[in-house]
Design a protein with these regions (language model features):
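Active-site nucleophile and cofactor-binding loops and adjacent substrate-binding regions
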Residues: 86-89, 109-115, 135-138, 285-291
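A charged helix-plus-loop insertion that forms the helical arch/lid used to bind
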Residues: 79-92
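Short beta-strand segments
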Residues: 10, 67-71, 111, 135-141, ...
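Conserved A3 ("GATE") glycine/threonine-rich loop of ANL adenylate-forming enzymes
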Residues: 14-15, 116, 140-143
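Short gly/Ser/Thr-rich phosphate-binding loop of adenylate-forming enzymes
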Residues: 93-99
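Glycine-rich phosphate-binding loop of actin/hexokinase-like ATP-binding domains
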Residues: 128-181
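ATP-binding/phosphotransfer module of carbohydrate and carboxylate kinases, centering on a glycine-rich
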Residues: 1-65, 74-80, 99-107, 120-132, ...
Length: 304
C-alpha cells in the first residue's frame, strides 16, 4: 500500500519552492522552484501560484492535501495573509478560499513559515523529539515558533512567537543584534578593536562563512564573537523558557552552522538566568531538516 503524500509549498521572498512529500519518510519528489519576483511583476501572483499548484496536482492525482508556509502574519483562522512584507500583493487576500474554489476536493493549510518549519521538525526530524519545544531560526533575522503538545502555539490572535523582537542589548531588539547584517557589523567592529593575531580580515569584509571557518580552526577572535552572539541569544531564550515553561530548544536557519561555537555561551548564560526547575531537563539542540525545513514544514501542516 502506497503511503500518503502531501504537497508542501515554501513561499519565500526570493523563491517559491514546492514538492511532493511522502508523509511516512519525508522523501521529496517532483521538486519545483520559481523566482517569486517574476510572479509578482506579472501582477497576478495568486494566479501564477495557482498554475504551479495545478501542475503538481495534475501530475500527482492522489494528493489531496496542500500545506503552504508564508513569510509573515496570518489571520487567526489561517485563511488570509495579513502582512507578508516580501509579497504585499497578497495581503488581505482570501488565499485558502481562492485555492479551494479552483481545486475542489483539495484541502489547503496556511501557516507562517517559521511555525511550519518548527512543526516539520516534530514529524520529519532524524531523531524523535519531545512534543513541546521552542524553535529558533538564525538567518537574515531571528525567527521562531513554539510547539506545544504537537501543536503550533499561535497566541491570542494568531501571531505569537516573534523572538527576534525581544528587547536585547544596546537598546535594540534581538535580531538587530544577531541578524546576519548586524552580526557582520559586530564582527567587523570587534576586528577593528582587536590587537591580537587573527585570520579575520581587517578590511571590513568578514563573511559569516569565514567567521565559522575561523572558529573551526580555533581563532580566538572568531570564537569570542560567536560567544557574544550566544550570550545575546541565550538572554532572549531565558525569557521564552520561563514564560512558556518549555525546556527543549531547537536552533536552525542559515546561521545555525555556528551552533557548536555559540552553544557553550548559551549554556553558561542560561545557567546564570534560570533557576533549578528550568534547568532540569533543559536541552539545546541543532535542528536537523536544513534546507528542506521550509518545504517539509509546509507538508507537515497537512497532518493537523
Amino acid at each position: 500500500m502506497a503511503s500518503v503524500e502531501y504537497l508542501g509549498i515554501d513561499v519565500g521572498g526570493t523563491n517559491v519552492k514546492m514538492g511532493i512529500v511522502d508523509a511516512g519518510t519525508g522523501k521529496i519528489s517532483n521538486f519545483y522552484s520559481h523566482d517569486t519576483d517574476s510572479w509578482r511583476q506579472s501582477g497576478h501572483f495568486i494566479d501564477r501560484f495557482g498554475d504551479a499548484v495545478a501542475l503538481q496536482l495534475l501530475a500527482n492525482k492522489d494528493v489531496k492535501h496542500v500545506g503552504i508556509g508564508l513569510p509573515g502574519m496570518l489571520n487567526r483562522e489561517r485563511t488570509v495573509p495579513l502582512e507578508i512584507t516580501a509579497i504585499p500583493e497578497i495581503d488581505g487576500l482570501p488565499m485558502v478560499d481562492i485555492l479551494s474554489k479552483r481545486f475542489p476536493g483539495t484541502q489547503f493549510f496556511l501557516e507562517n513559515d517559521a511555525n511550519a518549519a518548527a512543526l516539520g521538525e516534530y514529524y520529519f526530524a532524524e531523531e524523535k523529539i519531545n512534543e513541546n519545544y521552542i524553535f529558533i531560526t538564525l538567518g537574515t533575522g531571528v525567527g521562531g515558533a513554539a510547539i506545544i503538545n504537537k501543536k503550533i502555539f499561535t497566541g491570542g490572535d494568531g501571531n505569537a512567537m516573534e523572538p527576534g523582537h525581544i528587547p536585547s542589548r544596546n537598546g535594540r531588539v534581538l535580531e538587530r543584534n544577531i541578524g546576519k547584517k548586524e552580526l557582520l557589523e559586530l564582527a567587523n567592529l570587534r576586528r577593528s578593536e582587536y590587537t591580537g593575531t587573527t585570520q579575520l580580515s581587517a578590511d571590513g569584509d568578514i563573511s559569516t562563512t569565514g567567521l565559522v571557518a575561523a572558529a573551526a580552526e580555533g581563532d580566538a577572535l572568531a570564537l569570542r564573537i560567536w560567544e557574544e552572539v550566544g550570550e545575546m541569544l541565550a538572554e532572549g531564550l531565558a525569557s521564552l523558557i520561563k514564560i512558556l515553561d518549555i525546556k527543549q530548544v531547537l536552533i536552525g536557519g542559515g546561521l545555525s552552522a555556528s551552533f557548536d561555537y555559540i552553544l557553550p555561551a548559551i549554556h553558561r548564560t542560561l545557567d546564570y538566568w534560570l533557576n533549578p526547575y528550568y534547568k532540569n531537563g533543559l536541552a539545546i539542540k541543532r535542528a536537523t531538516l536544513g534546507n528542506d525545513a521550509g518545504l517539509l514544514g509546509a507538508a507537515s501542516l497537512c497532518f493537523e
